[in-house]
């Protein structure tokens, strides 16, 4: 087998920005930002906007996300696109 063909698989902390929940798991994703975990070890931390802790499908609750306005920006940008000349 070839060496150095697979990405590094290591423990990382995912930080859910919407709910503030952090969880430790393993992933090939890496980050220069680190955090000290409950066990005293330091791990890379990945910030995510939505995880199973904050997604309405998993929580059963409707939440308002602060990414509102994307549709309005899209419509404003392409308002005249495809119109008759």
From Swiss-Prot:
Please give the InterPro entries that the UniProt record associates with this protein.
Ribosomal_bL28/bL31-like_sf, Ribosomal_bL31, Ribosomal_bL31_B, Ribosomal_bL31_sf
- Where does the source fall among the domains of life? Bacteria
The UniProt entry's GO biological process terms, in alphabetical order, are:
translation
What Gene Ontology molecular-function terms does this entry list?
structural constituent of ribosome
Keyword list (alphabetical) reads: Ribonucleoprotein, Ribosomal protein
Q: Name one Pfam family in it.
A: Ribosomal_L31
- Report if keyword Ribosomal protein is assigned: yes
Transferase as UniProt keyword: no
Mind telling me which GO cellular component terms the entry cites?
ribonucleoprotein complex; ribosome
| Family indicated by similarity | Belongs to the bacterial ribosomal protein bL31 family. Type B subfamily.
Subunit details for this protein? Answer: Part of the 50S ribosomal subunit.
| Annotated NCBIfam families | L31, PRK01678.1
Task: Name the chain's protein.
Answer: Large ribosomal subunit protein bL31B
Q: Which organism is it from?
A: Arthrobacter sp. (strain FB24)
Gene designation = rpmE2
């Amino acid at each position: 087998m070839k060496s150095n063909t697979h990405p590094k698989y290591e423990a990382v902390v995912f930080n859910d920005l919407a709910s503030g929940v952090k969880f430790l798991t393993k992933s090939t994703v890496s980050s220069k930002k680190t955090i000290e975990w409950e066990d005293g070890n330091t791990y890379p931390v990945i910030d995510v906007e939505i995880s199973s802790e904050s997604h309405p499908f998993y929580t059963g609750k409707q939440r308002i996300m602060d990414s509102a306005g994307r549709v309005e920006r899209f419509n404003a940008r392409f308002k005249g696109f495809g119109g008759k000349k």
